[in-house]
Amino acid sequence: MKKSGLLNPQLCAAVARLGHTQTFVVADAGLPIPHEVPVIDLAVVLGTPRFQEVFDAILDEVVVDGATIAHEALGHEPESWVRERIEEVHTVSHEDLKKALPNVSFVVRTGETTPYSNVIVRCGVPF
C-alpha cells in the first residue's frame, strides 16, 4: 500500500501516463461527459468528495502549464479555487469547455455541487 499521495489505482495510473501538453479535467458531479472519454468517478454522494480536495491531491502529483475554466465561473468559488492554485488560467464559454472534452486524456468526476466547478488542466514538464 502507498503511504502518501494519490491512492485510487485508476487515478494513479492515469496521472502516471500524462505527458507534456496533455490535458485532463477535474469535474463537478453534473458535467456531461462524452461516452468515449475515460472517467475516474470518485463521487460518493452529492457534495463528496469536494472539488478542492481532489484538485489539490492531483496537483501535488502533476506539473501544470495552465488551465481553462468556464466564463460562467468568473466571480464565483470555482474561479478562485483554480486561480489560487494555477497561474495561467484561460476562460471559454461553458459550451466550449464541454466541446473540448473529447480531446482530454480523462475526466475525474467529484461529488462537487457548486455550479461550473470544472477545470481543464494542461500538463507541463518539470525541467
UniProtKB/Swiss-Prot annotation:
* Superkingdom of this protein's organism: Bacteria
UniProt keywords (A-Z) are: Carbohydrate metabolism, Cytoplasm, Isomerase
Catalytic activity, per the record? Answer: beta-D-ribopyranose = beta-D-ribofuranose
The cellular location(s) given in this protein's UniProt record come to: Cytoplasm
Q: Where is the active site?
A: H20
Cellular component terms (Gene Ontology): cytosol
Q: In which pathway does it act?
A: Carbohydrate metabolism; D-ribose degradation; D-ribose 5-phosphate from beta-D-ribopyranose: step 1/2
Q: Which GO terms describe its biological process?
A: D-ribose catabolic process
Which E.C. number(s) belong to this protein?
5.4.99.62
**A GO MF term:** monosaccharide binding
**Which positions does UniProt annotate for substrate binding?**
D28, H94, Y116, S117, N118
Q: What class of enzyme is it?
A: isomerase
Entry-linked NCBIfam families:
PRK11797.1
Chain's role? Catalyzes the interconversion of beta-pyran and beta-furan forms of D-ribose.
What HAMAP family is this protein classified in? Answer: D_rib_pyranase
The annotated subunit structure for this chain is: Homodecamer.
The family assignment reads:
Belongs to the RbsD / FucU family. RbsD subfamily.
Instruction: Provide the protein name.
Output: D-ribose pyranase
Q: What is the protein's species of origin?
A: Cutibacterium acnes (strain DSM 16379 / KPA171202)
